[in-house]
Amino acid sequence: MSFPTDMETNEILDQLDKIDERNEDILLKSLKASKCTYKPWSREEFLRRLLTYRSRWAYVNDPQIGEINCCLNGWLCESNNILVCDVCRNKINLTALQQVDAENDSLNELPEKTKERLEVSLKEEHQDNCLWRLHKFPPDIYHLSVSAELVQVGRRFNSLSTRLVSTHLPEEMTLKRLEKVANKIRVDWEKEDAAVLLGIALTGWSEQVPGRLYVCNYCHRRLGVWNLQSEGQDFDVLEEHKKSCPWVIPQPFTDLLGWQQIFELLCKESIFQSTTKTMDVSQYTDYTFSLLQGLR
């Protein structure tokens, strides 16, 4: 196993930082300039807007003013402490919180009433006639598109390179089940490290830099292989997602996590205990694949 040198690692990071900064600036400008940015029904639009927070927002982990809640209320991230609405053009400036955050180590130390007021401001700081004030994204917009992900698993697998780091998969992903999935989605089971690469694809990870950098297109989490190598850690395909990522939280109409739902559908068997009534798995997958295979 070859480890990247410090120079190679720094070069990759510098390039990615420049690309991210440029791409997020372009995305922000594009969203602000668009004539039709109000699409509270669109999951694709929500994920695109969420991307503006990836390397900027200072309060990612706070449930009340974190990136998910801000994005649900129609705000784009302009900088570490500033939100902007692309419809009414109003802004929310939280620069004053930086000092409070520094003194308390965490926003969790803020008085609950203060946090509640901040959360309310996500709605009230829009202008009175702003569409985002009248109707925000529905809370369940941030979940997996099941039909799309059933197809994307195979595409992610085909694009993955040979792994360069030890990988930890869920224990339910046995070789027998993974081979079953490989046959179902018609990918090369003889490919080197096929079982592990399929497990990576089944949990939502794609490659941004071949063999070096993985990315999730839902929570926009990026993981550098060199970080794991230098610390002697495994790539835990579930733990590395953000805690709010649809791949690792219960999905609508079921208490199964995102990856569990996709895995069960592809295996065509009941693997995980579910307390809610779910659809007929075999009927759903047969119909979905007969429809989607024709689009390949």
From Swiss-Prot:
Q: Which GO terms describe its biological process?
A: mRNA transport; nuclear mRNA surveillance of spliceosomal pre-mRNA splicing
Give its localization.
Answer: Cytoplasm; Nucleus
* Residues in C3HC-type zinc fingers: 40-174
- Any one GO molecular function term: RNA binding
Domain of life according to the entry? Eukaryota
Q: Which PANTHER family is this protein grouped with?
A: NUCLEAR-INTERACTING PARTNER OF ALK, ZINC FINGER C3HC-TYPE PROTEIN 1
Give the protein name, as stated in the record. mRNA export factor rsm1
Lineage in the entry? Answer: Eukaryota, Fungi, Dikarya, Ascomycota, Taphrinomycotina
